[in-house]
Amino acid sequence: MRSSLLLGLTVVLLLGVTVPPCMAGQALNKLMPKIVSAIIYMIGQPNAGVTFLGHQCLVESTRQPDGFYTAKMWCTSWTSDNPIVGEGRSRVELEALKGSIRNFVQTASDYKKFTIEEVEDWIASY
């Protein structure tokens, strides 16, 4: 009886340790469209600049000779210790920009540069 109790507690502890990252990933996936929309909106504003979670960022796109657009997003002041560059590529410039934003945000999340709560607060204040 004791061994089954210990086994049950071990399973509960293992599940408790492994579930939160999955839930954080799901939460980020749900927030991603709002993050991308907010940053795309900033790009469209004259002289506004892009600010993500209080950090100045650059988002740019370039049309390649093959007709595709490549886009990049980075925030040098925020990730200077470990540079993160989000990249996107598409025949449509807007889709390349969106891809670079998603890639940047996902990579920054993987490096634990922010919490889901910080992103939720940023979206709410925007």
Swiss-Prot record:
Keywords: Antibiotic, Antimicrobial, Secreted, Signal. Has antibacterial activity against the Gram-positive bacteria E.coli (MIC<50 ug/ml) and P.aeruginosa (MIC<25 ug/ml), and the Gram-negative bacteria S.aureus (MIC<100 ug/ml) and S.pyogenes (MIC<50 ug/ml). Its main location: secreted. GO terms for biological process: defense response to Gram-negative bacterium; defense response to Gram-positive bacterium. It is found in: Secreted. It comes from the Eukaryota. GO terms for cellular component: extracellular region. Residues 1-24 form the signal peptide. The lineage of its organism: Eukaryota, Metazoa, Ecdysozoa, Arthropoda, Crustacea. Strongly expressed in gills, hemocytes and reproductive tract, with weaker expression in muscle, heart and digestive tract. Not detected in eyes and hepatopancreas (at protein level). It comes from Scylla serrata (Mud crab). This is Antimicrobial protein 1. InterPro entries: Anti-LPS_factor/Scygonadin, Anti-LPS_factor/Scygonadin_sf. It holds the Pfam family Anti-LPS-SCYG. Gene3D superfamilies: 3.30.160.320.
